[in-house]
Design a protein with these regions (language model features):
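Active-site-proximal region of nucleotide-activated glycan assembly enzymes
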Residues: 24, 93, 152-213
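N-terminal amphipathic/hydrophobic targeting modules at extreme N-termini
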Residues: 10-30, 35
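Conserved donor-binding/catalytic loop of nucleotide-activated donor transferases
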Residues: 154, 293-295, 309-315
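Conserved nucleotide-sugar phosphate-binding/catalytic loop shared by glycosyltransferases and other
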Residues: 43-48, 70-116, 262-264
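Acidic donor-binding loop of glycosyltransferase active sites
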Residues: 133-135, 277, 293-308
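An amphipathic, basic-hydrophobic alpha-helix
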Residues: 106-135
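An aromatic- and histidine-rich active-site surface loop
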Residues: 81-85, 135-154
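Donor-nucleotide binding loops and adjacent catalytic segments primarily
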Residues: 81, 86, 90, 214-298
Length: 315
């Protein structure tokens, strides 16, 4: 997977230049050039809900702050999203919108969600006017739509990031409005105006960039990491529980960390205890980079962000 570094002009306008550098695992960085180092940049990153949307946004935010601690980052999300749980611990400010998804819901909930859209646009307008951003980036998720759309009509530069090969509904709509569309896969260009798109890979947080020494297999027990994304995966949880009877002869050689999500945590915990397994059961793993580095084998969903992070750690 190619690694790219992006050079933005000093006004963070609609002109971007890109240059390819060395190969690395699915990573790109927004790079403020030397001529722009003294400029204070204010950026809103909107969206989230799941780790697949949120963590690439955090990677971009970390890189802007690494370039200059005077740059300002504000996240816009929802009260129910993953962003509410973790952004404060990472030192980022978060403001929330009262907005819900529409796709895949019943008629009553769809109507309720539609009625919340005007309110979320008013909330976005107030947040943007108070913060005065140079750029608003949508990372996917419910809050991304109102915030990016509002910024567009306020003539603020906008961009979206699409991590998946098949873009979500929100990004497909926003693609018609924004100034730039940053893609992980070239195939995704078919869904957007091609002149706006740039294939850059999936942003990965700096904590996942490790040296070769930390990738060596650990001595002692075989470490197995099982997770299903930020919300857990019932199918993976059920499959692992079905496999436990076949692992009884390996118990003394095996250590498991299993991130279950909230719904299955009690059932999974009871099954591990009944089979006498050395297992740590968690709802959510904050330091995924450390979890990857300490594992010998990973069993997980093939989410775009998970694959990029796993590739970056050399697994």
């Amino acid at each position: 997977v190619r690694r790219y570094i992006r050079d933005a002009d000093t006004s963070l306008g609609s002109t971007f230049h890109i240059k390819k550098v060395d190969s690395y695992g699915g990573i790109y960085f927004f790079n403020i050039p030397e001529t722009c180092q003294g400029t204070i940049v204010k950026i809103i990153i909107a969206g989230g809900g799941t780790g697949g949307h949120l963590f690439p946004g955090i990677a971009v935010a970390e890189e802007f702050l690494r370039r200059s601690r005077e740059n300002s980052i504000l996240f816009i999300g929802t009260e129910r999203g993953l962003e509410k749980k973790i952004l404060g611990n990472l030192g980022f400010n978060l403001l929330t919108l009262d907005v819900e998804g529409i796709k895949g819901r019943g008629l009553i909930k769809k109507i309720s969600a539609l009625f919340k859209i005007p309110q979320s646009i008013v909330q976005s307008n107030r947040i943007i006017r108070d913060f005065h951003p140079n750029l608003v980036i949508g990372v996917g998720g419910y809050a991304s739509g109102p915030a990016v759309m509002t910024a567009h009509f306020m003539t603020i530069k906008t961009a979206i990031m699409e991590q998946n090969a098949l873009p979500g509904l929100t990004n497909r709509i926003l693609g018609k409005l924004v100034d730039r569309i940053f893609l992980t896969f070239a195939e995704t260009r078919a869904w957007f105006p091609e002149e706006k798109t740039m294939v850059c890979g999936n942003p990965v947080r700096a904590s996942f960039l490790v040296d070769n020494e930390s990738r060596k297999r650990r001595e002692g027990k075989f470490n197995l990491l099982i997770f299903g994304g930020s919300q857990g995966a019932h199918t993976i949880n059920r499959a692992v529980l079905g496999a436990l009877p076949y692992l009884k002869n390996m118990r003394q050689h095996l250590r498991i960390i299993h991130q279950t999500g909230e719904k299955d945590v009690n059932t999974v915990t009871e099954n591990y205890e009944r089979h006498g397994m050395d297992a740590e059961i968690v709802l959510f793993i904050i330091d995924m980079a450390r979890a990857y580095r300490s594992s010998d084998l990973l069993i997980c969903r093939a989410g775009a962000t998970s694959i990029a992070e796993i590739t970056a750690t050399g697994k």
